[in-house]
């Protein structure tokens, strides 16, 4: 299936009326022919913004781009919003808004919010103006045809119901997790806590915990239920109760990575210095400044010794605890996280009858040590090996395709379907069981615009992580010893 086959001769969707943020609908789902919807349709046709209402100020892109600090101004659907006073209350964290300041955030906005009609209510008080007549609907340096084609692709995915989740799929994964958790306890109850039993239940709990990581990822991206509140409930239960980690901290951190993948210093996933130097520019920067906290020429060995075993029990656990107990913003949500996480430890104390408190804590961290390499390989194989740069303010499609790659998987559940990383980054709220359906359309669109759609074997992707670390180390050494 190709992208062009899903479009009509004029590039529009065949047999479907597009809807846009803020468009009203009649009871049967048909759009009301109001002025705002018609105006937006015309804007999309010519790629420029129409005459704004007289009550609103007019802005040029040059003026907006000056407000690119500390969540100042951003543009959504040709409208200009000042979010500086509201950023700290943003459910996705203030940093996401900081990263989009002074930019067209339309595609980001749509990608991260499944219930656009509700989010529009929060935007109304923040509206300060519109783009001036004649200004393009996105920054001038962006490819307007590419932006339009991706919007068409999004509408195609909606028309094919690719954003509708199969609840049975996620229910079976949830039941599998609970069965493994209960089975582990029953085995200890019947057979005691000897070493063979302990290692076997650790294996079961590792599968359960890894599956929980993937399920909380689904719920955190609001891709299970149509109503966000039910996704939040499932996310709290799985992330906090089953994994003992802060759901809110994960949201803030992970959404930054989605909005600005592989972009220094906005993507926290590549902010690993001084322990690891990633990409091409960061190692050279450290080398020229003669910075040597560790022997970076052996950082690929530290990947095996440090990153693989300590990612879950240390790298994720400590910042999660810090977010819950030390950070003052979003206090009410931190208290919710603390309550949920407390239930994780109470639940695990049921093993204390057989292992004691200290033995139970060792069991918890043994499982996290075993889970950690699994999650590291799955999450890092799609990003560390790809292009890293400072902010270049590219369009959504180009940003995501340059920073991510797909891997061939014989068993998608092993990776939580994250082997379709490109599709996941382009459509964060799409249920993962639909990634394979939209992948051919994405591949076709990338080919049309000359973007390299990377899809590699999984074992090669694993090896590329180490090869990327060695390459960065060599760049550091060249700059350090010159």
From Swiss-Prot:
Transmembrane segments: 168-188, 191-211, 306-326, 344-364
Motif (Histidine box-3): 421-425
Pathway stated in the Swiss-Prot or TrEMBL entry: Lipid metabolism; polyunsaturated fatty acid biosynthesis
Keywords: Electron transport, Endoplasmic reticulum, Fatty acid biosynthesis, Fatty acid metabolism, Heme, Iron, Lipid biosynthesis, Lipid metabolism, Membrane, Metal-binding, Oxidoreductase, Transmembrane, Transmembrane helix, Transport
Cellular localisation: Endoplasmic reticulum membrane
Motif range (Histidine box-2): 254-258
Name of the featured protein: Putative fatty acid desaturase 2-like protein FADS2B
Species this protein is from: Homo sapiens (Human)
Classification of source organism: Eukaryota, Metazoa, Chordata, Craniata, Vertebrata
């Amino acid at each position: 299936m190709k992208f062009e086959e899903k479009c009509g001769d004029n590039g529009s969707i065949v047999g479907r009326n597009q809807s846009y943020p803020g468009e009203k609908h009649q009871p049967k789902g048909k759009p009301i022919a109001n002025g705002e919807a018609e105006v937006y349709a015309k804007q999309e046709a010519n790629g420029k913004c129409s005459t704004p209402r007289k009550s609103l100020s007019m802005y040029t892109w040059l003026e907006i781009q000056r407000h690119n600090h500390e969540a100042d101004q951003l543009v959504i659907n040709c409208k200009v919003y000042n979010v500086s006073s509201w950023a700290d209350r943003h459910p996705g964290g203030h940093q996401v808004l900081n990263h989009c300041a002074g930019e067209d955030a339309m595609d980001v906005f749509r990608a991260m919010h499944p219930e656009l009609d509700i989010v529009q209510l929060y935007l109304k008080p923040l509206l300060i103006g519109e783009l001036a007549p004649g200004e393009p609907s996105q920054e001038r340096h962006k490819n307007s045809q590419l932006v339009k084609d991706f919007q068409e692709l999004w509408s195609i995915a909606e028309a094919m119901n690719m954003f509708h989740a199969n609840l049975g799929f996620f229910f079976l994964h949830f039941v599998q997790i609970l069965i493994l958790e209960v089975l582990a306890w029953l085995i200890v109850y019947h057979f005691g806590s000897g070493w063979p039993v302990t290692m076997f239940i650790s294996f079961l709990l590792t599968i359960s915990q890894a599956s929980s990581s993937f399920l909380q990822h689904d719920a955190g991206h609001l891709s299970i239920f149509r109503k966000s509140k039910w996704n939040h409930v499932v996310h709290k239960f799985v992330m906090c109760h089953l994994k003992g980690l802060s759901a809110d901290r994960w949201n803030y951190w992970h959404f930054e990575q989605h909005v600005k993948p592989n972009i220094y210093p906005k993507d926290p996933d590549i902010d690993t210095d001084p322990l690891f130097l990633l990409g091409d520019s960061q190692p050279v920067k450290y080398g020229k400044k003669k910075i040597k906290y560790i022997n970076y020429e052996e950082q690929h060995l530290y990947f095996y010794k440090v990153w693989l075993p300590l990612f879950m029990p240390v790298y994720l656990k400590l910042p999660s605890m810090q977010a819950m107990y030390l950070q003052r913003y979003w206090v009410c949500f931190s208290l919710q996280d603390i309550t949920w996480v407390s239930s994780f430890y109470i639940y695990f104390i049921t093993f204390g009858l057989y292992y004691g408190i200290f033995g139970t804590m060792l069991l918890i961290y043994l499982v996290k040590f075993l889970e950690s390499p699994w999650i590291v390989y799955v999450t890092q194989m799609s990003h560390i090996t790809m292009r890293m740069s400072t902010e270049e303010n590219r369009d959504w499609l180009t940003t995501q395709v340059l920073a991510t790659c797909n891997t061939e998987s014989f068993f998608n559940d092993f990776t939580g379907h994250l082997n379709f990383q490109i599709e996941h980054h382009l459509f964060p709220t799409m249920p993962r069981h639909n990634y394979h359906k939209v992948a051919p359309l994405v591949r076709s669109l990338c080919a049309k615009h000359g973007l390299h759609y990377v899809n590699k074997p999984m074992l090669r992707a694993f090896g590329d992580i180490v090869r990327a670390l060695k390459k960065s180390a060599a760049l550091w050494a060249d700059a350090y010893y010159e």
